[in-house]
Amino acid sequence: MDQNNNTVSEFIMLGFTTDPVIQKVLFAVFLVVYTLTLMGNSSLIMLICNDSRLHTPMYFFIGNLSFLDLGLSSVYTPKILETCISEDKSISFAGCVAQFFFSAALDYTECYLLAAMAYDRYVAISKPLLYSQAMSLKLCVCFVVASYVGGFINSVIITKDTFALTFCNDNVIDDFFCDIPPLVKLACGKKKSFQSVLFFLLTSNVIIPIVFILATYLFIIATILRIRSTQGRLKAFSTCSSHLISVTLYYGSILYIYARPRSSYSLDRDKIVSTFYTVVFPMLNPLIYSLRNKDVKEALNKLLK
C-alpha cells in the first residue's frame, strides 16, 4: 500500500452528527458502553481462567471470543470518542489503514471462531460422552489459531486492495470509522477488480462460515429431536441458544451492510447498523453467554465471596 499512489494524506470523519449537544450525549453513551465492554469481557476472561469448572472447550472458545471483542471495541471506540468531543475530525492515512486492517482482521477471525464454536456445540450435543476426548485442547487451540491466521491473511488482502484505490482528492468519510462502503464511495477509477476481491472475501469469510453454521445447526436440531424427554431437549437446546443468538446478531448485521446491492446502500442507515456490530455487540456478548449460564454465575459468586 503505497501512499504515493493516492492523492490524500488524511481523511476527515463526519461521524454521526455535527450538532455539538448530540455529540456530547453520544460521547457519554459510547463511554459507558466501552467501559461496560471492557469490564464485562475482562471479567468473563478472568472467571474462565481462574475457575477450574470453566476449563472446558466451550468456555475456551467463549474466552477467546471475549478477547476478540475487547480488541474490536478498542479498535473502534477510542476514535469514536475522540471524534465526538474534538474539533479535529481527521485521521491520518496510516491511521486509517491501521484501523481498517485490525478491524477487518478481528472481524474475519470472529467469523471463523463462531463457526468453530458451532462445531463445538454439535459435538457436545451429539456425542456428550466423548465430548472431552473429541474436543481436545490441542484441537481447540488449532481452531483458534486457524481462525486468527485466516482472519489476518484475508485482512492483508482486503486492506491492500482497498488502499490501492485512488481517492481523487476527496477525503471526507461519511462514517465513524474507516470502512469499505464509504472508502469505495470516495474512490475513483477502476473498481471492478476490487469488487471481485470483495465478493471473494465476503464468500470465504462470511457466506461459507454461515453455511457451515446452518448445516451444523441442522444436525444439532436433528439430534435434539431424537431426545425423548422434554427436559432433555430443553437442556440440549440451552447449551447452544446463546451461541445462536450471538451468530444471528453478528452475521445479520454484517450481511445487511456488505451483502446488499450497491444501489441500496444508505450510509446514514448503515452507520446505525455498524454501531451495533462494532460497539454494542462486544458489550452484549458477555451478557448473552453468562446471564442464563449456571456455571458462570456460580464462578462469579465464588469470586465475590
UniProtKB/Swiss-Prot annotation:
Compartments where found: Cell membrane
Organism of derivation: Mus musculus
Stated name of the protein: Olfactory receptor 9G19
Keyword annotations: Cell membrane, Disulfide bond, G-protein coupled receptor, Membrane, Olfaction, Receptor, Sensory transduction, Transducer, Transmembrane, Transmembrane helix
Membrane found in the keyword field: yes
Membrane topology: Multi-pass membrane protein
Family membership noted in the UniProt record: Belongs to the G-protein coupled receptor 1 family.
Keyword Membrane: yes
Lineage of origin: Eukaryota, Metazoa, Chordata, Craniata, Vertebrata
